[in-house]
Amino acid sequence: MKRDAIDLSTLKVFPLFRKYFIPTLLGMLSMSAVTAIDGIFVGHGVGSDGIAAINICIPLLMLFTGIGLMVGAGCSVVASVQLSRGKSQVARINVTQALLFVTIVALIPSLLMMAFPEKTALMLGSSETLLPLVKDYLSWFVPSWVFQIWISVSLFIIRLDGAPRLAMLCSLITAVINVALDWLFIFPFGWGVMGAAFATSISIVAGGVVAIVYLLFFARRLRLCALKWSAKSIRLFARNIGYQCRIGASALLGEATLAVLMFAGNQVFMQYLGDDGVGAFGIACYYIPFVFMVGNAIAQSAQPIISFNFGLGDSSRVKETECIALLTAVVCGAIVTAVFTFWPSTLVGLFLDLDDAAAQIAVGGLPLFAVGFTFFIINLTAVGYFQSIERVIPATAFALMRGCVFLVPCFIILPQLSGTPGIWYAMPLSEILTTVSIILFFLYNRYNPVHRNNQTGTANPHADTQM
């Protein structure tokens, strides 16, 4: 299986970043396309109720994906640092432990949700009207979530192993299969929401299998390995996973921010505008993961370069990489904002007939929502930087600001001040406030020498005592 020749310590930073960024971006956009394709076919095959039903289920998927991103990001940072020090076996052990852990974490709640789909749907905020559709979607979608969490973790590892194009291929396979099966199951077969869920499940399983097969048999430096099992080994396993989760916690919080955004937005739109409002917000929520993945692609493309050179102690390459990443974030954010500002009707029309009440609400709301996209991407990039140099506290703090500290109050206060536009402006204001906080933090570090000198980061103190 072909790999890219990538030397993280000597190649010029910009070409190196580009080599990671382009396939990572394409792969991540393909991952976002999986649920968006569901929405497009369901919108035309079932209607706005189908979109609303899927949107109610998505926060749970975001939570599972977030756990995968947390472990994957933490594992990737640890493995990068260990590889920079020549400790490839320690890196392999961390990778294997990470995948074992997420398998257990995904399997147990998935089984519970499959056993109690109605209770799960009601817990997520489904109305009685939408309940049958939400149950159908959950029943057929949940079984694939173990594979989804495998994909979330494995793509970090595959890129670090020097195969960013293969990581992109895993995502493309998932998206292509989903497009074909969505059309087949929703239109010729007439299976509606259930067909969309079944198509997505099959496509996710295919992508997950490709990723795991690579790590089992074809990986160059990070192939999965056998683990020892003893009381001491289990203690070390728990400690290593705890360290990975600590480093990657901000990645989980980033995904949790999307879940909070969708869950809180669903409740507020239901309160102010009913099912049509949820359907309109559902269209926005189909696009939000694309924006999230742009920011995530920038952060994840910079992460191997930053973490590896951080492990080597090469601060100049670390700073250069972050400058390139932030500039990329600003450019990408401006492009995305322009698209949503000038062509909302085109974007909404992919999902619903523009005469639909939900579509009309969405056309008016998307330009307001798009005000926050540049800040959204910048914040993800900045949080990814802190995560890559093992600065857990600022990474976690800024992720919490986006997801809880600012977002929830904005959803509560702004609609009371300005009605429906206030709901759309909640996310942008939250992201702007977070960006301001990050800038102030950077300025404080820059102009406070004592504080700056204490911020060199720390590698895993237990690196030499892995299982």
What label would you give each PLM region?
Residues 1-21, 79-144, 188-249, 306-372, ...:
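Short alpha-helical transmembrane segments in multi-pass integral membrane proteins
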Residues 8-46, 59-74, 78, 103-110, ...:
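N-terminal transmembrane alpha-helices
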Residues 19-38, 140, 151, 174, ...:
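Transmembrane helical elements of multi-pass membrane transporters/channels
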Residues 24, 28, 40, 77, ...:
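Transmembrane alpha-helix boundary and packing residues in multipass membrane permease domains
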Residues 28-32, 66, 106, 110, ...:
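Residue-level hotspots within the lipid-embedded alpha helices of multi-pass solute transporters
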Residues 33-51, 121-128, 184-191, 252, ...:
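Helix-terminus/linker motif at the lipid-water interface of multi-pass membrane proteins
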Residues 51-111, 148-167, 270, 280-342, ...:
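Small-residue-rich hydrophobic transmembrane alpha-helices
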Residues 72, 141-159, 167-178, 196-212, ...:
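Short runs within selected transmembrane alpha-helices of multi-pass transporters and secretion channels
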